[in-house]
Every structure is written in structure tokens, then in C-alpha cells.
Amino acid sequence: MELNCDVQRKRKISDLRPIASIDTQLRIYYEHAEIGTDEVRMLFGQNISNSTVSRLKKLARAKMADMEIQYIFSRFCVNTEAAYAAWGIDVNDLERRKKKLAALKLLDA
């Protein structure tokens, strides 16, 4: 049986990975206690749909509930620490990688 190559597999939200640089990911993490749609788009790309942003926030809200974290500023935002945990963004790993890049003199000044 031949598969139709024109049919695209619907991507799961768990397949989505951040496209932002290490510096951008760390800057967002340390600058914002809660993040909204703008920051989510900075992390995952400006072209992601509103429904994808909503699904990412839903994952983060579930993690907030697990971690028993309350909203600080707005119910339209999600806690940054919980969001990064829900999305599989490891801040310690990012910092380690940034130090390695600096040691190899591969970081832009």
C-alpha cells in the first residue's frame, strides 16, 4: 500500500520545541515571573497559531496546579517556572550550555 506524501501528520503539542536562542530563553525566564502570549511566541516562533499558544498555556496551567502555584498578575499569563517545566525547557541545562559556549569563545559579544 502506498502512502500519500501530501498528507501531513498532525503535530502533537509535545513535538513542539523552542526555537529561541539560549540567551532569549534565559532572559524570558529571569525577567518575567509570568509570561503571556508575546513571550510564548518569542520562545516558539511568531508564526504559531493562537490555538497552539492556548494549548501551551493549558499545559503550563496544569503544571501550575500540580506545583500549587497561584496567579500573581493576570489569569491570561502563566507562571514562568511552571511553563518551562511543562514545556521541557531545562534552565540549568541552558545555563550549562551557555557557559560551555562562552568557554569555547563561541558567544557573540
Where are the predicted features?
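Basic, low-complexity segments
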Residues: 1-8, 90-93, 99, 109
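Compositionally biased amphipathic helical and low-complexity segments enriched in hydrophobic
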Residues: 4, 17, 27, 44, ...
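Coiled-coil-like amphipathic alpha-helices with heptad-repeat character
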Residues: 4-6, 12, 50-52
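A detector for short, charged/polar N-terminal pre-domain segments
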Residues: 7-33
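Positively charged, low-complexity intrinsically disordered regions
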Residues: 9-12, 42, 97
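Generic signal for short, ordered secondary-structure residues
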Residues: 18-20, 39, 62-63
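Polyanion-binding surface elements
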Residues: 26-52
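Major-groove DNA-recognition helix of helix-turn-helix-type DNA-binding domains
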Residues: 44-85, 89-95, 101-106
